[in-house]
Amino acid sequence: MAYRFQGFLYGILFLAFFSLLSLFISATLTPFLSPLIIGILLGAALSPFYPKLNQHYDIQAGITFGAKKLLRLGIILYGSYITLGEIATLGLNGFLISLFIVAGVFIAAIFIGKMLKLDNEISLLVGIGSAVCGAAAILALESTLKTHPSKSSVALGFIVIFGLIGMILLPAIYYANILPLNDYQWGIFIGASLHEVANVVGAAAISPESQNVAIIVKMTRVVLLVPLLLIISYIIFKLNQKRVQNDTNIPNGDTHAKQNALYIPYFAFGFLGVIVLNSFIDFPPVVVESTQFASKICLVFAMVALGLQIDWQKFISFGAKTFALALILFIILMFGTYGLVYIMF
């Protein structure tokens, strides 16, 4: 028992070291990259050594704790970045454009993934990462679907690439004065189209008005993660039920009942609860900032743990089609969002 706890502790300390390193690199060397992204890159670089590390130090329990428990806690605490009052300032059109983007891009990912004959789970992961909020959304859906880390990693890889492209491309277009948009409209455009919160903050620095609006639009998309996760869970449950009814070879019993049970992502309600608390209780700034930092730490832990568990053979096998899906969704995001902004604002 003591040996197993020691292995668990080694796993947590391992994640802590590389999580703190990710935060340091992000803050000093690469401020344009989220520490979450740096975390998964460090984990991925170390993944070939993970089997031997686990064999010698039995760190699996600590790594699993980081990848699952701390992930969910991080998503719950992520609600501290958002208030309902900020979302309300956008008005109906601001909410609708976020809703159209999230729903449209996610549905497009499902159909385009089928056309490309891509793995269903990867299509969903790339779809939610593009539609909602990049890494955090992919991690939340991974926890709901219980997918293999390699699938999440390949989805994250291409979301990072196109998020960075968008972060560079949109300010370049703004300064070239190509599109007939004012700063407010640019804020809507950037907030509704880019993948990561960090991408939005970086790209929207073109003006104070654009940045304020862009962040609120982005957080509105983040809030829509909750109903989307619940809808996905319910649809998967119904599809599993239908599959079981059509397959007479599947045995009945407790094990089967568990496999076919409706999974409710309770952490999504926790996320929503923190948003509500943050909206109606005037917490001291130190409490809000500490909660936000705790969320970031938990999510970086999860990203390092996820990167460690990458199966590179699977990662490579999913590569080309996943790139194609992420590219098509990026084009849809750019042109679709611009069209909606032009029409609605």
Curated annotation (Swiss-Prot):
Segments traversing the membrane: 7-29, 33-50, 90-112, 122-141, 154-176, 186-208, 215-237, 262-281, 293-312, 322-344
Keyword hit for Transmembrane: yes
Domain of life the protein comes from: Bacteria
Membrane topology reported for the UniProt record: Multi-pass membrane protein
Pfam hit, one: Cons_hypoth698
Record InterPro entries: UPF0324_pro
Subcellular localization: Cell membrane
Keywords noted in UniProt: Cell membrane, Membrane, Transmembrane, Transmembrane helix
Any Gene Ontology CC annotation: plasma membrane
Family: Belongs to the UPF0324 family.
Stated name of the protein: UPF0324 membrane protein HH_1161
Organism: Helicobacter hepaticus (strain ATCC 51449 / 3B1)
